[in-house]
């Protein structure tokens, strides 16, 4: 036991720390446990991985307080002196699967980019080759072509430039995500362009190269017609890839499975996989960040409620597990009448403590910012070399508010998402831009969207799309698909926007006029 120590700080997997005292037994029994069908172990181990940022006040002073926080067990991790990390066969299998998936995605990405680049070069070099091949192969046999051909050359050059810019703007954009399937319309356009260019080459080879056509003006017009057709195909691509999806046709209800938070989005004609991409892009900016620590209180309450029940068999020992389970359920139902009172008082006490610590935090931050204003007034009288930068000013006032901020983050279970380094950066940012204490506290008083936090706090970087239909199919009324990540899932329900009938009703302006008749007895 002399090699063991208790580390109190912000752990990435703090919600699993209650099981840390059983890791030794599970490690010894892991070699004896039966394997699943896919070759992975049935036991799951918890990898202890502290965040990259420095924990907020993770020193000895916070661990020796007389009054500990109620959730100290959730933010405490036991680390032995021999190893700080543990890994199971399931983790190894997951890592290998992720590596295989990444290799497959990279191959698919580079293959698609190679095919598109080759086809683009073929498209832009084909009209130029149509014009250059006859003068190279049978220059002396060609009929002279003067001003008309020169005008066609200028026209084709500008059309190729417009086509090049339009193709770059439409197709050569940075990929936002890796799709599980190909984009159907884009693949159809590539096939159409390939067949179109091949048919032009076949006609050019049979009717011009084999017969050595002498009409050079006709050859140039043939190349210009190819460029015109390519411009029309580019217009078709804009309609199919961009304009078709602009008009809203469906409403998507997105519900997070853990806490039930939901949002509604309106989309046009999209495939299921592209609709899933739009949902995920909006999820990171609209949904509050997922905090698994908020769910541990209800689980602990249910476990505590069932732990107080015990079944005794007066008839002697037996293996009737079903009867014992029924007895436990019946006893829990009888105790359910008083459990709501416990929940009410627990929530009331928690709200009281949150308000108390919020008030302390607000006062501490306001005093710190007043101190900053005083320092700024004093530094205006100093020499330029003696003035502190915003980073130094943030480090100077941070200790005065650190304790109150730490207690508030711990009672609201946000300690995993705010490291000391991130708080200092935010404080320096607020000082640089002259923000008020309320602007500084807004990030910590309420949970913000996922994009507000560091990427290592998101807990969701890779998603799996689960659907009963092919992901390349378009959206329609009643479709339900699920986006799953490691800790939670997003359930998406598709509803078609109803057809609205508007009728017009004309009101004669003269109907609003009235006559006021006054009498001697009428008081106005």
From Swiss-Prot:
It is a multi-pass membrane protein. Coiled coil: none annotated. Residues 1-15 have a biased composition (Low complexity). One of its GO terms (biological process) is pigmentation. Changing residue 239 to I: In SDAM; abolishes ability to interact with DVL1, DVL2 and DVL3. It is found in: Cell membrane. GO terms for cellular component: extracellular region; lateral plasma membrane; plasma membrane. Residues 73-85 have a biased composition (Polar residues). Changing residue 274 to Q: In NTD; does not abolish ability to interact with DVL1, DVL2 and DVL3. Changing residue 153 to S: In NTD; uncertain significance. Changing residue 181 to Q: In NTD; uncertain significance. According to PubMed:11956595, ubiquitously expressed. According to PubMed:12011995, expressed specifically in testis and ovary. It comes from the Eukaryota. The modification Phosphoserine is found at residues 86, 88. Keywords: Cell membrane, Disease variant, Membrane, Phosphoprotein, Transmembrane, Transmembrane helix. The chain crosses the membrane at residues 118-138, 152-172, 183-203, 223-243. The keyword Cell membrane applies. The keyword Cell membrane applies. Residues 1-85 are annotated as: Disordered. Residues 1-117, 173-182, 244-524 are cytoplasmic. Its main location: membrane. It is linked to Neural tube defects: Congenital malformations of the central nervous system and adjacent structures related to defective neural tube closure during the first trimester of pregnancy. Failure of neural tube closure can occur at any level of the embryonic axis. Common NTD forms include anencephaly, myelomeningocele and spina bifida, which result from the failure of fusion in the cranial and spinal region of the neural tube. NTDs have a multifactorial etiology encompassing both genetic and environmental components. Heterodimer with VANGL2. Interacts through its C-terminal region with the N-terminal half of DVL1, DVL2 and DVL3. The PDZ domain of DVL1, DVL2 and DVL3 is required for the interaction. Belongs to the Vang family. This is Vang-like protein 1. It comes from Homo sapiens.
